[in-house]
């Protein structure tokens, strides 16, 4: 269970890093929002899911 928790935290950190870098680049590029809207929404959904997964797994690890 500890390994699953650690991998989920690692995925959350990686997703957060990609979103912090990717979203401003998308907004800065011409017509970036129109073409990359699905990337932003998919990344946000993945990030929210990982936050809940970390919270749930944390209750099993502690």
UniProtKB/Swiss-Prot annotation:
Family: Belongs to the PsbZ family.
A GO term from the CC aspect: chloroplast thylakoid membrane
Keyword Coiled coil tagged: no
Compartments reported by the entry: Plastid, Chloroplast thylakoid membrane
Signal peptide: none
Membrane topology: Multi-pass membrane protein
One Pfam family here: Ycf9
NCBIfam families, per database record: PS_II_psbZ
Role: May control the interaction of photosystem II (PSII) cores with the light-harvesting antenna, regulates electron flow through the 2 photosystem reaction centers. PSII is a light-driven water plastoquinone oxidoreductase, using light energy to abstract electrons from H(2)O, generating a proton gradient subsequently used for ATP formation.
GO biological process, one term: photosystem II stabilization
Primary location recorded for the protein, binned into one broad class: plastid
Keywords: Chloroplast, Membrane, Photosynthesis, Photosystem II, Plastid, Reaction center, Thylakoid, Transmembrane, Transmembrane helix
Protein's UniProt name: Photosystem II reaction center protein Z
Gene designation: psbZ
Annotated transmembrane regions: 8-28, 41-61
InterPro entries, per database record: PSII_PsbZ, PSII_PsbZ_sf
Subunit structure, as described in the record: PSII is composed of 1 copy each of membrane proteins PsbA, PsbB, PsbC, PsbD, PsbE, PsbF, PsbH, PsbI, PsbJ, PsbK, PsbL, PsbM, PsbT, PsbY, PsbZ, Psb30/Ycf12, at least 3 peripheral proteins of the oxygen-evolving complex and a large number of cofactors. It forms dimeric complexes.
